Amino acid sequence: MNTTQLATLPTAINSPSNAIWHLGPIPIRAYALCILAGIFICVWWGDKRYRARGGQKDVVLDTALVAVPCGIVGARLYHVITSPDAYFGPEGNLALIPQVWHGGLGIWGGIGAGALAVWLYLRRRKLEVGTFAEAVAPTLLVAQAVGRLGNWFNQELFGAPTTLPWGLRIDAEHLPAGYAPGTLFHPTFLYEALWNLAGAAALVWLGRRFNWHGGVSMWAYMVIYTAGRIWVEYLRIDDAQHILGIRLNVWTSAVVCLIGLTGLFLTLHKQKAFAQVGAGLEEE
């Protein structure tokens, strides 16, 4: 590659110039499209993986129809509770709470509410939760990777300033106070998306290599996602609640990571014990 070719390489990632399109009077928001695309991939791929494990057709779709609305409500409530100034502060506006199309969904509220809805729904239908969890775990990471592109369109939740060639350009209207025009920022949406895609690939490979079952992949998903989320959170500069000088989402991620590690260890240990008992019975 010669000097001229090097000079023509991009030295930054541009933010999209538009995040909203109109179909007549109806606004079509990129943020919503990214979330919907992620949900579609999760349901489509999750259904294939679930049926490959002996599950019934359309169970993943039916479960998603319950879990997604609950997850959106949970995600919004988590955001409102952890970022209260925009809604309850001196200049807050309660009317903004239901306006999710402007952004502001806390992933932990979505995961918690969605997971509870899934568990209750599957229990009601008398379906094996572990098999379902095993099937959808990697698909969640892909869905979250696609959903993160919504932050790119909205020009939000980016990281600290950087001089790296993949720094993110932000329009003047979205530029945080105190930063000069032309400042480049860490594209945390891209970091998290790539981490999640790599994590999904790892889950698929590990599941096949070690014949994971019974929800092992879901525990591993919790560990992989939270490990990535912790280092990404340390890059971000948006306003956030802090506890002992550490962002709330870092604390939440650390707790969920520990739960995932514990669940992963106990589930694998339990399955190993069952396998040893089964081998002993066969020898007899």
Describe every region a protein language model picked out.
Residues 1-284:
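A feature for loop-to-transmembrane-helix boundaries and adjacent hydrophobic helices
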